[in-house]
Amino acid sequence: MPRGPLPAWARVRAVLLDVDDTLIDTRAAMHQAGTVASGVVWPAADRSRIALAGERFRSDPDGFFGAYTRGESTFDAMRRARIGALATWLGQELGEGHAGAWLAAYEPAFEAALRAHTDAEVALTRLAAHGIPVGFLTNSGADYTARKLALTGLGGLVDVICTRDTLGFGKPDPRAFHEACRRLGTAPAETLYVGDELLSDALGAADADMPAGWLVRDGAPDPGEADVVAGRGIPVLANLIQVADGLGCP
């Protein structure tokens, strides 16, 4: 992305940001906590699989989180379904009380490992100093999101927080983006959205007629995906500092 203000963002008056893996390193915390919890609940499971259990839990190959964002299950039911699928992958039974025990081990490990990305506070502070309202839009639950923001110190740096359960629909449904804009007090065309997921964040925002940025922290994106976003006029961002730079924030 070029340095300095972006002409494509000249009309932007507010910013909406995804939370997980955009502001907060949720991936690393889930990997660590999922492995800890699986080792506690299923100590007889293959150790090589236990070591990968957190990664498997987060990857959610059965799509339970997607079903939750579409309103097909509750947040709690979604998480318990993912635990059940993880037990099957580990070759273990999900007995009575196992899901609760897994969560009881997972939550403290997750909270201990949770960190904000180092650029998050800097970028948010620069946006605020420049008078740009900021909102967070996430497909996670309200209580869980509030706890994550409190633990990482980001809760006081936002004007509006919109979650899947408080909105009644999730990304990439255009209604989620439009309602978040309404709560910020800006039109979609003048509200920049930035997130790390290609479909639910970058392309979802573009489909909602918003300027968007695709955050790719871990290297260059897949060439085919890069072509897709380039064709939609969506810049690829390496960090959140580029959001503040692109909006001309000192």
Identify the function of each model-found stretch.
Residues 2-118:
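N-terminal helical cap/lid subdomain that shapes the substrate entry/recognition surface
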Residues 1-15, 27-28, 97, 121, ...:
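Asp-based, Mg2+/Mn2+-dependent phosphohydrolase catalytic module
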